[in-house]
Each structure stands twice: as C-alpha cells, then as structure tokens.
Amino acid sequence: MGKILVTGGCGYIGSHTIVELIQLGYEVVCIDDLSNSDGSAIAGIESITGVKVKNTKISVGDSVALQTFFKEEGPIEAVIHFAAFKAVNESVTFPLKYYQNNLASLLVLIETMKSYHCNNLIFSSSVNN
C-alpha cells in the first residue's frame, strides 16, 4: 500500500482518519500548522496503533515548505485534505483569513500534488457554528 498524506492530521477528524488508514495498512504522513490543535493527537495515534506518525509543522499554503515536504517524503500516493478553518462566525469577521487558508492554500496543495504526480485527493470539510 502507498503513502498517504493527511493535512490537518492533528485535528479530531484528521487524527481519527490516520488511525483508520494505519489499521488498513497504509503508511501515513501528516502535516499540520497546529493553528487549531496542539499536536497531542500524534501521541494518541501512536498509543492506539503502535505506529509512530511523523507530523511536520507547516502550512498547506506555504508553497516552498510543501514542495520540500513532497520531495523529501515522496512518492505520495494520495492526499486527504482536512487543513481548513471552520468557524462560521469567525469567517464572517475575517473573510480574507478564511479565503487565504481555505481556498488559496488548497490551490497551492493541488499545484504541488500536480508537480509530484500525486493525482488522488480527498477533500473534506466540516463546520463549527
């Protein structure tokens, strides 16, 4: 089985997805800028699965860091993308922040995937009122 990148993997949904992927036999790598989490989920994943998962603290919108990550970790077979802001009230107050993080960074991710011939993307989003 191939290597899967989970963005936002230190969050609730991302960390649970990583556990499932490991249990299915995938090698998983994670990136999370820790803006909405503290990274403690990584220890929980290891406790549950017995597998040490590497989290690299970078933003999906940082093109240079993302390119470096793909180069060092590749080949990556697929990306499951959870790295997005989700608070509706905050998005109304700070729309540019949400645009940059949720849309512009997604475009950086897609361009990087294209450069490294990673053609499989699962995009998921949740919301918090």
Could you tell me what each predicted segment is?
Residues M1-N129:
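N-terminal Rossmann-like NAD(P)+-binding domain of SDR-like oxidoreductases, especially those catalyzing
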